[in-house]
Amino acid sequence: MNKGNLIKNYAVALLNNAMVDNIQDKIFEEITSINRIITDNFDIREFLFSPIVNKNDKINAVNLLAKNIKISTIVQNFLLLLVKNSRTAILSNIVNAYNTLLYESKNIKIVQVISANKLQPKEQEWIKSRIEKELNQKTEILFDIDNTIIGGIVIKYDSMLQDYSIKGSLEKIKKALKTVNIAV
């Protein structure tokens, strides 16, 4: 099974378990929090991701972590399953896939907007309203900054990419100039 399908299968299983008790958002908050703790703490990350560390030690660590931060049984069992199957290294990917599935279940499209500088709240609202009008759907906008685009914005959703950046425009001009034969 390829990694993408594996990640999606884990995310779907977690979402289905959360739907039974109608706690999808709570589970997302918990799994995101756990992922942040693991990602931000080098020692915990190395311990859980290491193939050398005994699985029983990892299980004890997950149980201790669950007890200390009081997470649901669903998330605790899910983390234990990842440990038992040696899949803790893909937790971040599973969290992202879960997030996507959660928003899809609410008919909300996740859209990434990349700008060269931090956008003001009014600019963010304007962009959000334009995108929702274009897509005719509610959206969750993730605003990111990438100063290499020089100016403008890049919009990504599903497999679509709309490049309204200066860098993108310059690259299009460069490509067009390469295809033109100019006689001197």
Curated annotation (Swiss-Prot):
Pfam families associated with the record: OSCP
Q: How is this protein positioned relative to the membrane?
A: Peripheral membrane protein
Keywords attached to this entry: ATP synthesis, Cell membrane, CF(1), Hydrogen ion transport, Ion transport, Membrane, Transport
Molecular function (Gene Ontology), one example: proton-transporting ATP synthase activity, rotational mechanism
Primary residence: membrane
Q: Which Gene3D superfamilies match?
A: N-terminal domain of the delta subunit of the F1F0-ATP synthase
* UniProt subcellular location: Cell membrane
Q: Name one GO cellular component term.
A: plasma membrane
Q: Which InterPro entries match?
A: ATP_synth_OSCP/delta_N_sf (IPR026015), ATPase_OSCP/dsu (IPR000711)
Q: What task does this protein carry out?
A: F(1)F(0) ATP synthase produces ATP from ADP in the presence of a proton or sodium gradient. F-type ATPases consist of two structural domains, F(1) containing the extramembraneous catalytic core and F(0) containing the membrane proton channel, linked together by a central stalk and a peripheral stalk. During catalysis, ATP synthesis in the catalytic domain of F(1) is coupled via a rotary mechanism of the central stalk subunits to proton translocation. This protein is part of the stalk that links CF(0) to CF(1). It either transmits conformational changes from CF(0) to CF(1) or is implicated in proton conduction.
* Complex formation: F-type ATPases have 2 components, F(1) - the catalytic core - and F(0) - the membrane proton channel. F(1) has five subunits: alpha(3), beta(3), gamma(1), delta(1), epsilon(1). F(0) has three main subunits: a(1), b(2) and c(10-14). The alpha and beta chains form an alternating ring which encloses part of the gamma chain. F(1) is attached to F(0) by a central stalk formed by the gamma and epsilon chains, while a peripheral stalk is formed by the delta and b chains.
Alphabetical list of HAMAP family matching this protein: ATP_synth_delta_bact (MF_01416)
Family to which the UniProt record says this protein belongs: Belongs to the ATPase delta chain family.
Its name, as the record gives it, is ATP synthase subunit delta
Where does this protein come from, organism-wise? Rickettsia africae (strain ESF-5)
